[in-house]
Amino acid sequence: MAFFEVKELTKSFDDTEVLKGIDFTLEKGEVLAIIGSSGSGKTTLLRCLNYLETPDTGRITVDGKTYFDAEENKSLSESEIRLRRLHFGLVFQQFNLFPQYTVLDNLTLAARLQRCDELKKMYKEKRLTKVEYKQKKSAVRSEFNEKAAALLEKVGLSEKADFYPCQLSGGQQQRAAIARALALTPDILCFDEPTSALDPELTGEVLSVIKGLKSTDSTMIVVTHEMEFAANVADKIIFMANGIIEECGTPDDIFNHPKSPLLQSFLGKSAYTD
């Protein structure tokens, strides 16, 4: 069994079928690039993987464990969905940093709240004494600040920890958003057009960070319009069209030996050259 499997995933909005039976697998440490024209279903697929949308049918497994099953999902509570969502990190097009918090707090807030909820549950279940609960809770901030500092160093933002998002360039904000997604140690990190909101001169710094993550064996799914990036970084590429996977293969398969007329046309319009 592959590390990550998606089987027969479908999603409709009213009478519009957006995903029409999506199937693919991904091994741990691999990078998958998803390409295709606007409206092909790429972003909806990412949103389904992250429980931001609920698929109508299908099954998703992560490391041999069921992450989503259409029948089982009907009985999941909101808290269970939140826990499952932690398997995936998602970096949006528009950064989505909290403007009222510093870069450091943006990285640590969700993780700190998650840990405090876990400690509270352990205390209520009498697995922690009151003294132990208070001691561990008071240590949460320093613990996650230390982890966040290491992540900021990884994305080249160590000196910006105490800055607010409005004080950063677009590229720096997106790098902070990547670090924030990593802070929750997801099994799979997803990117939805991570450079689409950036000026061309800032695109390179964000793509460089993503390339660096590959060297750490991070498993990633990247929806992108950067064909050169997909060709150089991805282990496999999916081309989506009209809600289906029209073609899937290695970068060499997709860019040098495309079979689908739709893919051939798409690559011609993208002006990609090897």
Label for each model-derived stretch:
Residues 163, 184, 216:
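Conserved signature/switch motifs of ABC ATPase nucleotide-binding domains
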Residues 164-168, 172:
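Conserved ABC ATPase signature
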Residues 189-192:
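Catalytic Walker B motif of ABC-type/P-loop ATPase nucleotide-binding domains
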